[in-house]
C-alpha cells in the first residue's frame, strides 16, 4: 500500500498571532460574564511595544479593555523587553463601535419570523453572516482528532509548560512545533519528523543545550509510550533550524487575531470555511456552527457510523435554518451516507439559537479555546467535544 507523509503545525500561547487571539477572547469573556447577550466582534493587532484593539460591540456590560490586554500579555510571560514585549509598559489603543443595525436586525428578527413562516422562538434568531463551516473527526486518536495536529498541540503545550515551570529556564514565550506523520492508506504508522522552534535567551548553545533539553523535556514525555500503533523510533528531530531565535514575540513579528485558523482546527487535515473564531460571540456562525460541526462529526465517529467524518453546514445571513448540510465519510462509513445525513438532521438542531442553547455558548469560556486548538481537548467547558448524541445517531441510522 502506498505510504504518504502529512504535516501539521501548532504554536505556543506566546506566538504573536495567539497573543492577539487570547486578547480578543479575553475581552469577549469579560463582556459575556456580565451580559450573556453581548454581541462582540473584536480584533487585535500587536506589534513592537503597541497593542491596537478594534471592532464592534453591542452590550450592557463594561470591560476594562486596557487592563485585559495587559493582564493577558503578562500572564503569557511577556514581562520584559528582553523577551520581546512588556505587558506592563506597552501602549494600548482602543477603537470600538457598535454592531451594524443592518446586521443586528437579521440576527434579532430572522427571515422566518419576518415573513410569517414560523413563530418558533428558535426561528427568531438568524445567522449572523453567510458562509460555510466544517467539522471533522476521525479514529486516529482517543480524542478523535488527526494524529499530526494532536501531537503538534501536545508538543507546543509541553514547550510552554517547561518554560513556565522553570524546567528549561532560558526558554521564552514564543514557539512553534510541527509534526510529520507517515500514513499507510488512511492509517498513521510512523512518526517521520518533529520540528521545534523556540525563542530563547541570549548565548544559549543550540547543539549542547537547547536540542538535548528539547529532546528530553519536551518531546520524550509526549512521544515515548505514545502507543496508538505509531512507530516513534528513528524520527528526524529539527530544533531551531535557523540557528538562533533570540528575537521573538511581537518584536519579531506583528500578531493579528484570526491568523492561525488551521492551527485552531484540524491542522489542514480537513477543509475550513475561512472564518476565524477568536473575538466573536456565538451569534457569529463562523464560530458557533464550526463548533457544532465538530460535535456532529465526532458523534458520527463515536457512534461507529464511520471511521472519519467531515460535516459541512452553510447559512444565509438573517435566516435561522441552514441552507445546506453535507456529510463526507471518505469510504469509511458502516451504513449508507444518506442515512447518516438523515440521522444528523433528526438528531441535531442546527439553527443558531439551538446551537447556542445546546452547547451553552453564552458562557465566558472562550479564553481557554484561544491557544492549543479549539478541538480535541475534552475539557468540561468544551461542550462540542461531548459524544452525548452518539447513541441517538446510531439508533436513527439503524446501525
From Swiss-Prot:
Gene Ontology cellular-component terms listed: cytoplasm
Listed name of the protein: S-adenosylmethionine synthase
Subunit structure: Homotetramer; dimer of dimers.
Residues where Mg(2+) binds: 17
Annotated residues for binding of ATP: 15, 174-176, 244-245, 253, 259-260, 276, 280
Enzyme Commission numbers on file: 2.5.1.6
Subcellular location: Cytoplasm
UniProt source species: Salinispora tropica (strain ATCC BAA-916 / DSM 44818 / JCM 13857 / NBRC 105044 / CNB-440)
Family to which this protein belongs: Belongs to the AdoMet synthase family.
Role: Catalyzes the formation of S-adenosylmethionine (AdoMet) from methionine and ATP. The overall synthetic reaction is composed of two sequential steps, AdoMet formation and the subsequent tripolyphosphate hydrolysis which occurs prior to release of AdoMet from the enzyme.
GO function terms (MF aspect): ATP binding; magnesium ion binding; methionine adenosyltransferase activity
UniProt-annotated stretches for the region Flexible loop: 99-109
CC cofactor note: Binds 2 divalent ions per subunit.
Catalysed reaction, written as an equation: L-methionine + ATP + H2O = S-adenosyl-L-methionine + phosphate + diphosphate
Principal place of residence: cytoplasm
UniProt superkingdom: Bacteria
Alphabetical list of PANTHER family matching this protein: S-ADENOSYLMETHIONINE SYNTHETASE
Binding site for K(+): 43
One family name in Pfam for this protein: S-AdoMet_synt_N
Binding site for L-methionine: 56, 99, 253, 284
Amino acid at each position: 500500500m502506498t505510504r504518504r507523509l502529512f504535516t501539521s503545525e501548532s504554536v505556543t500561547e506566546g506566538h504573536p498571532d495567539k497573543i492577539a487571539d487570547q486578547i480578543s477572547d479575553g475581552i469577549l469573556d469579560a463582556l459575556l460574564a456580565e451580559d450573556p447577550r453581548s454581541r462582540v466582534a473584536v480584533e487585535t493587532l500587536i506589534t513592537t511595544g503597541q497593542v491596537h484593539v478594534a471592532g464592534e460591540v453591542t452590550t450592557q456590560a463594561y470591560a476594562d479593555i486596557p487592563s485585559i490586554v495587559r493582564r493577558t500579555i503578562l500572564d503569557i510571560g511577556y514581562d520584559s523587553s528582553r523577551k520581546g514585549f512588556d505587558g506592563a509598559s506597552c501602549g494600548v489603543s482602543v477603537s470600538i463601535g457598535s454592531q451594524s443595525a443592518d446586521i443586528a436586525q437579521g440576527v434579532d428578527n430572522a427571515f422566518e419570523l419576518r415573513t410569517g413562516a414560523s413563530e418558533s422562538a428558535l426561528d427568531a434568531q438568524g445567522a449572523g453572516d453567510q458562509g460555510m463551516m466544517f467539522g471533522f473527526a476521525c479514529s486516529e486518536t482517543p480524542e478523535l482528532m488527526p494524529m499530526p495536529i494532536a501531537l503538534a498541540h501536545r508538543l507546543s503545550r509541553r514547550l510552554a509548560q517547561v518554560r513556565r515551570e522553570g524546567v528549561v529556564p532560558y526558554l521564552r514565550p514564543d514557539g512553534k512545533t510541527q509534526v510529520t506523520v507517515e500514513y499507510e492508506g488512511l492509517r498513521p504508522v510512523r512518526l517521520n519528523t518533529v520540528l521545534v522552534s523556540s525563542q530563547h535567551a541570549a548565548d544559549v548553545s543550540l547543539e549542547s543545550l537547547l536540542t538535548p533539553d528539547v529532546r528530553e523535556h519536551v518531546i520524550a514525555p509526549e512521544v515515548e509510550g505514545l502507543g496508538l500503533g505509531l512507530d516513534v523510533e528513528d524520527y528526524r528531530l529539527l530544533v531551531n533550524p535557523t540557528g538562533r531565535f533570540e528575537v521573538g514575540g511581537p518584536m519579531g513579528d506583528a500578531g493579528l487575531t484570526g491568523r492561525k485558523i488551521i492551527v485552531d482546527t484540524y491542522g489542514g487535515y480537513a477543509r475550513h470555511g475561512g472564518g476565524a473564531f477568536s473575538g466573536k460571540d456565538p451569534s457569529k456562525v463562523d464560530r458557533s456552527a464550526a463548533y457544532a460541526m465538530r460535535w456532529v462529526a465526532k458523534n458520527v465517529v463515536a457512534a461507529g457510523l464511520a471511521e472519519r467524518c467531515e460535516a459541512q453546514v452553510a447559512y444565509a445571513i438573517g435566516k435561522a435554518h441552514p441552507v445546506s448540510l453535507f456529510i463526507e465519510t471518505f469510504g469509511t462509513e458502516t451504513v449508507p451516507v444518506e442515512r447518516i445525513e438523515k440521522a444528523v438532521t433528526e438528531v441535531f438542531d442546527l439553527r443558531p439559537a439551538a446551537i447556542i442553547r445546546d452547547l451553552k455558548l453564552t458562557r465566558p469560556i472562550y479564553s481557554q479555546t484561544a491557544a492549543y486548538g479549539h478541538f480535541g481537548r475534552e475539557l468540561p467547558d468544551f461542550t462540542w467535544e461531548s459524544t452525548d448524541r452518539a447513541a441517538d445517531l446510531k439508533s436513527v441510522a439503524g446501525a
